[in-house]
Design a protein with these regions (language model features):
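Histidine-rich, glycine-flanked metal-binding segment
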Residues: 1-46
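Active-site microenvironment of metallo-dependent hydrolases
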Residues: 1-7, 12, 20-22, 76-77, ...
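Metal-associated gating/positioning segment near the N- to mid-region
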Residues: 44-121, 145, 200, 232
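Active-site gating loops and adjacent loop-to-helix segments of metal-dependent hydrolytic enzymes
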Residues: 58-86, 136, 141-147, 183-196, ...
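Histidine/acidic residue-rich metal-binding segments in metalloenzymes
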Residues: 117, 159-178, 183-258, 274-275, ...
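His/Asp/Glu-enriched, well-ordered alpha-helical/loop segment
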Residues: 211, 215, 281, 291-361
């Protein structure tokens, strides 16, 4: 990423339409065309940030104890009034993302078809918000991560494939799998990221999704989970785990990329339990996941595997307006420069999301 000096940005209807050198702009007599000149007086414009791992269904407010998200979502989606209220909240959260400097989000698990609906409302100018690449509901398994809340619980390969047809009808932009458990799913020390989804299901969904033209993102928080995901066709690893040579080789063999998410595990790993209300097991496993994500990011960067950033907003302690923290954590814990962190959250994110021709630089 290099700073470009002496540039002119043309904006029409609140959209950047062109960026050109000041010398060229001077030849075009833009004022005569109705443009108003705003001199930034030496300031810089940063490309819009790209948050590659978002759940629009949550505000990040920590709970004193775990709640039954499956029951809560079932209640919310059970009638028109509560659904309308929930959609209004989701719209507000997307607006928060935009006003915090995030101009593109990639949603990887949400309520029903809310995310694609909002994507289209924003594109049509009906709602303010960032560009959205939407997966809608993810695919999990009974007892799996987020099952019944922002992901369906597929009891068989057939059910998982049926959901792909629903997702296609909703015109999603990508598919999301929940392959392993998460920090709060593990009931014993040392086993966060337990494999929940059978490799056969992962492969079946990836094969069909690819045939439909979709990329597949997968929640994985253990070395075994990462390897199962990559071996069976997953395109992006969300979170990651401690890397070894086999894992790195699989990333390269399958041209996959890593979405680093330091924000969700950090509170459980580093905050005092009196603040997080976490159990000793949750704190221990939070640290395992946090260290694994850091290690995976470092290994990926060292081996030229593409890395993007997401903050897993919706998880406890992560708000819809603090994606900037993820960049700081990336710098502090992975050891990258500020410049590289900005590059990762702009240009690299745009490239991996397939929108590098319209944003990111």
């Amino acid at each position: 990423m290099q700073v470009q000096e002496g540039q002119v940005i043309l904006v029409e209807n609140e959209r950047i339409t062109e960026i050109l050198p000041a010398e060229e702009a001077g030849k075009r007599n833009l004022k005569a065309s109705g443009y108003e000149e705003i001199d930034l007086q030496g300031k810089y414009i940063l490309p819009g940030l790209i948050n590659m791992h978002v759940h629009l269904a949550g505000n990040g407010k920590p709970q004193k104890k775990q709640r039954d998200n499956e029951a809560l979502v079932k209640k919310i989606m059970s009638n028109g009034l509560t659904k309308a209220i929930a959609y209004h909240m989701v719209c507000g959260f997307a607006k928060d993302e935009l006003y915090s400097g995030v101009t593109t989000i990639r949603t990887v698990g949400g309520l029903g078809d809310f995310d694609t609906r909002l994507r289209d409302d924003i594109a049509a100018g009906k709602k303010p918000g960032p560009r959205i690449l939407a997966a809608n509901e993810g695919i999990s398994v009974p007892g799996g991560h987020m099952a019944g809340s922002v992901a369906i619980a597929a009891g068989s390969i057939e059910e998982a494939l049926q959901h792909l047809e629903i997702a296609k009808a909703q015109k999603v932009d990508l598919v999301k799998l929940m392959i392993t458990g998460g920090v709060l799913d593990a009931k014993e020390k040392g086993v966060p990221g337990e494999l929940k989804m059978a490799p056969e299901m992962v492969k079946a969904v990836c094969d069909k999704a690819h045939a439909m033209g979709y990329k597949v993102a997968a929640h994985v928080e253990s070395p075994k989970g990462v390897k199962v995901a990559l071996q069976n066709g997953v395109d992006s690893i969300e979170h990651g785990a401690k890397a070894d040579e086999e894992m790195i080789a699989l990333f390269k063999e399958h041209n996959a990329f890593l979405c680093t998410t330091l924000s969700p595990a950090l509170p459980y790993a580093l905050f005092d339990r009196s603040i997080t209300n976490a159990s000793e097991v949750e704190q221990f496993n939070g640290n395992v996941v946090f260290e694994g994500i850091i290690d995976c990011a470092k290994a990926a960067i060292a081996n030229d595997i593409p890395v993007v950033l997401g903050n897993d907003v919706g998880c406890p302690w992560i708000t819809q307006y603090d994606f900037w923290r993820e960049l700081y954590y990336f710098h502090k814990y992975v050891g990258v420069s500020n410049t590289f962190a900005l590059y990762t959250a702009t240009c690299r994110g745009a490239e991996m999301a397939g929108i590098g021709d319209i944003t990111g630089t």
